[in-house]
A protein has these predicted regions:
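Adenosine ribonucleotide-centric catalytic and binding domains
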Residues: 12-66
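Short, well-structured alpha-helical segments in soluble
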Residues: 101-116
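Gly-rich Lys/Arg/Thr-decorated short loops/hinges at beta-loop-alpha junctions or inter-strand turns
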Residues: 46-52, 81-90
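Single conserved hydrophobic/aromatic residue that forms the stacking wall/gate
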Residues: 1-8
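Charged, often glycine-rich, active-site loop that binds/positions anionic groups
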Residues: 83-105
């Protein structure tokens, strides 16, 4: 129940999204891809047989709630939505690399870009 009306919000998601032209995710890729909140050419690189992409195809907000974040900003609940969001491949065999390397690196990047709040969006 805090006051987030002046805070900048970003989303971190695990749906292996990336933009056209960015490197796709490989099975052991612990890195992240920077997503633009305004560029809507998202592609999913999720290779798990357990991932159903129907929801993603029907509504991007099922895996990346960018429209919901924009609505929160428009209503004054948050200050604004960051232009930078991060996407990881959540279907990892070993999460140690994300926990110890790319996760902290992504957090550092977002802090440097002025992000105050990160919405974690696992799929």
């Amino acid at each position: 129940q805090g006051d987030w009306s002046s805070d900048v919000c970003s989303s971190d998601l695990s749906a292996s999204l990336h933009h056209a032209g960015q490197e796709d995710f490989a099975p052991t890729d612990i890195g992240y891809r920077e997503l633009s909140g305004s560029k809507r050419d998202y592609q999913t690189g999720h290779w798990s047989p357990n991932f159903d992409s129907v929801g993603f195809a029907a509504d991007i907000n099922t895996v990346f709630p960018i429209d919901r974040l924009n609505e929160l900003a428009e209503s004054g609940r948050i200050g604004r939505v960051s232009e930078t969001h991060l996407s990881y491949a959540g279907n990892q065999f070993d999460l140690a690399g994300v926990r110890l390397d790319s996760g902290p690196a992504g957090a550092k990047l977002l802090r440097e870009r002025g992000v105050d709040i990160v919405l974690l969006t696992p799929v």
